[in-house]
Amino acid sequence: MSSVIASRRYAYALLSAADEGGFLDDVTAEMEMIGETLAGSRDLVRVLASPLINGDRKTHILEEIFRGRVGERMMRFLSLIARKKRAGILRGIASEFKVLLDEKNGVVNADVTSATELSGEQAKELVNGLAAYTGKHVRARMTLDPEMIGGVSVQIGDTILDGSIRHQLQVLRRTLSVEEA
C-alpha cells in the first residue's frame, strides 16, 4: 500500500474518531503542531522513517518530543502508528488530516497568481467569485509572477482557471492558425 493511501487512511480514522468523540478541535491543533514540528526537523523525519530503528524506540522518541504538548489520546495514536511501523508517514498523516478537515468543512485552497498585486477589494471580489464558482469557502494564497503580462491565473486542486493575457494570446494564436489552415 502506498504511503499516501496509508496516510489518508490513518488521517481519516483519526478525524472520524475525533469528530465522533467531540474532541476534533484539540486533535486539529495537535496535528497542526506535529506537522509543523516534522516540517522543521529533517532529522526527526529520517529517524521515524528508518527501518533500523524499532517501533518501541520510535514510540519513546515521539513521547520525548510530544509528551506534555499533546493530549493522551494523541499520544496513544502516535504510539499506535509507531508500533504498526507507520511512524515514517506521520508527516503525510498530518498533511492528509488537514486536507480531510478542509473537505469536511467545505474549504478549498486556491493558488492565485497575478502579474501585479491585487488590491484588497480585487482580492475579495475574486475570492467571492471563486466561492460562488466552487460552492465552498475559498482559502486563497496570492503570489506574484512578473513573467505574466497581465490578468490572473487560479488553480484549485486539479482545475486551472487561466485568465492571464498570455493564455488569451495563446488561444487567439491557435484560433488564427486553425483559420489559416
From Swiss-Prot:
It is a peripheral membrane protein. GO terms for cellular component: plasma membrane; proton-transporting ATP synthase complex. The keyword Cell inner membrane applies. It is found in: Cell inner membrane. Its main location: membrane. One of its GO terms (molecular function) is proton-transporting ATP synthase activity, rotational mechanism. InterPro entries: ATP_synth_OSCP/delta_N_sf, ATPase_OSCP/dsu. It comes from the Bacteria. It holds the Pfam family OSCP. The keyword Ion transport applies. Keywords: ATP synthesis, Cell inner membrane, Cell membrane, CF(1), Hydrogen ion transport, Ion transport, Membrane, Transport. F(1)F(0) ATP synthase produces ATP from ADP in the presence of a proton or sodium gradient. F-type ATPases consist of two structural domains, F(1) containing the extramembraneous catalytic core and F(0) containing the membrane proton channel, linked together by a central stalk and a peripheral stalk. During catalysis, ATP synthesis in the catalytic domain of F(1) is coupled via a rotary mechanism of the central stalk subunits to proton translocation. Belongs to the ATPase delta chain family. F-type ATPases have 2 components, F(1) - the catalytic core - and F(0) - the membrane proton channel. F(1) has five subunits: alpha(3), beta(3), gamma(1), delta(1), epsilon(1). F(0) has three main subunits: a(1), b(2) and c(10-14). The alpha and beta chains form an alternating ring which encloses part of the gamma chain. F(1) is attached to F(0) by a central stalk formed by the gamma and epsilon chains, while a peripheral stalk is formed by the delta and b chains. PANTHER family: ATP SYNTHASE DELTA CHAIN. HAMAP family: ATP_synth_delta_bact. This is ATP synthase subunit delta. It comes from Chlorobium luteolum (strain DSM 273 / BCRC 81028 / 2530).
